């Protein structure tokens, strides 16, 4: 499913996970301004439930197929409490293959705009 989602979003959108609406919107607007867009992904209790373990308080990987990025975000969320946070999953946009092989530099334009906006 992660592979399908990466293909579905292509090399245009990066996935964003956040527990804070204002932070998520700030990142989305910074990305739009930089022409480096993000697509917000769900943080759902079902992904957290998939991290249950018989051997540890919390597993760091789900035993279910797919949704690896979603369960990874659920894992991160377990450690931040009420702190606003966001994770940009850049796996689908960080590199190009073929004749344009190499790093894209993304999400640097988004992050520069985001930090400028925060400084104002």
Model-predicted regions and their roles:
Residues 1, 6-120:
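A generic structural signal for tightly packed, nonpolar segments enriched in small/aliphatic residues
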């Amino acid at each position: 499913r992660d592979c399908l989602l990466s293909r579905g979003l292509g090399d245009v959108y990066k996935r964003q996970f956040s527990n804070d609406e204002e932070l998520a919107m700030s990142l989305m607007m910074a990305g739009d301004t930089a022409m480096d867009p993000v697509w917000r992904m769900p943080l759902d209790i079902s992904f957290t439930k998939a991290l249950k373990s018989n051997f540890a308080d919390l597993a760091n990987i789900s035993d279910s197929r797919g949704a690896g990025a979603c369960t990874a975000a659920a894992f991160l969320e377990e450690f931040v409490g009420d702190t606003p946070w966001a994770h940009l999953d850049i796996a689908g946009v960080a590199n190009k293959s073929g004749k344009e092989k190499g790093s894209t530099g993304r999400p640097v334009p988004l992050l520069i705009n985001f930090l400028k906006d925060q400084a104002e």
